[in-house]
Design a protein with these regions (language model features):
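Acidic, polar-rich low-complexity tracts and alpha-helical solenoid repeat scaffolds
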Residues: 5, 16-269
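Hydrophobic core
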Residues: 12-14
Length: 269
């Protein structure tokens, strides 16, 4: 009995394979699209793609084109071909503005760009592109059921950009004394704090700004030292005002003692 079932399964598999190969070689668009739809419904997306990529160029403007291009776009998505899926969904949404699938296509297209966003340490061109696509979706469909997920994706991407900006500012601080360039890290930290006023890295950024100003003051010529020591002291006060129990307090307090000791020579003049 088991042997019979095994033989039948093999025969069915060969029959299915033969049907697929015949459809690929066929010039009949109806044969290709019918079998592609069957494969799509059964989750065989790679075969769906192979058939529809052959058929789709000849179907533009035809009555069933909308369905075909949606299936092709979704098949790209399901097989994680996100670049192809992103542009396919974008094209679908543009070409079929009245389609009931347009909203879904717009969201999935934007999500495809999100999937290509790299880790924060790499170039973020794709992250900015994904944010642009997601924001466009949010503006177009403010009441969409996809809105909660769209907002989650936007937050994740903006958090990534925030972390990258912070790490760049932090790196500037770490090399400031070595290169004797203190203005650059101060400017970068100021830009970061202005761009991300509610950042979770604010305590860190405020300390790094203070630390940079502290280094700047101690490495200054006498004619500019007093002013820079005063600026460093003000940065310390800003840090403590933001968080009196800052994790940097022990280090910052020691730096402040040195700043005040340096300032005494000017108060005695």
């Amino acid at each position: 009995m088991n042997k019979i079932i095994y033989i039948l399964l093999i025969a069915f598999a060969f029959g299915s394979c033969s049907e697929y190969q015949k459809a690929l070689k066929s010039d009949d668009l109806a044969v290709k699209t019918k079998l592609a739809a069957d494969y799509y419904e059964s989750g065989k997306y790679k075969k769906t793609i192979a058939l529809l990529e052959q058929a789709s160029p000849s179907l533009r403007g035809k009555p069933n084109a909308e369905k075909i291009f949606y299936m092709l776009s979704k098949s790209y998505y399901e097989t994680e071909q996100y670049y192809l899926a992103g542009y396919a969904f974008e094209s679908f949404a543009s070409n079929y503005p009245k389609s009931e699938k347009r909203e879904e296509a717009a969201f999935l297209g934007a999500k495809c760009f999100y999937t290509k966003s790299p880790r924060y340490s790499l170039d973020q061109t794709d992250t900015y592109k994904a944010l642009e696509k997601l924001q466009s979706f949010i503006d177009t469909y403010p009441k969409s059921d996809y809105m909660p997920m769209a907002n989650v994706l936007v937050k994740e991407l903006t958090d990534k950009l925030e972390k990258k900006a912070f790490e760049i500012a932090k790196q500037y601080n770490s090399i400031a004394e070595y290169y004797r360039d203190f203005n650059a890290p101060i400017k970068v930290l100021d830009i970061f704090l202005a761009d991300y006023p509610g950042t979770k890295y604010k305590e860190d950024a405020l300390y790094y700004k203070f630390d940079t100003l502290y280094q700047y003051a101690l490495n200054s010529v006498d004619s500019k030292k007093q002013e820079r020591l005063t600026n460093a002291k003000m940065a310390y006060e800003t840090l403590i005002k933001f968080r009196s129990d800052t994790k940097y307090k022990d280090t910052a307090d020691k730096q402040l003692v040195e700043i005040e000791r340096e300032l005494t020579q000017y108060s005695n003049n």
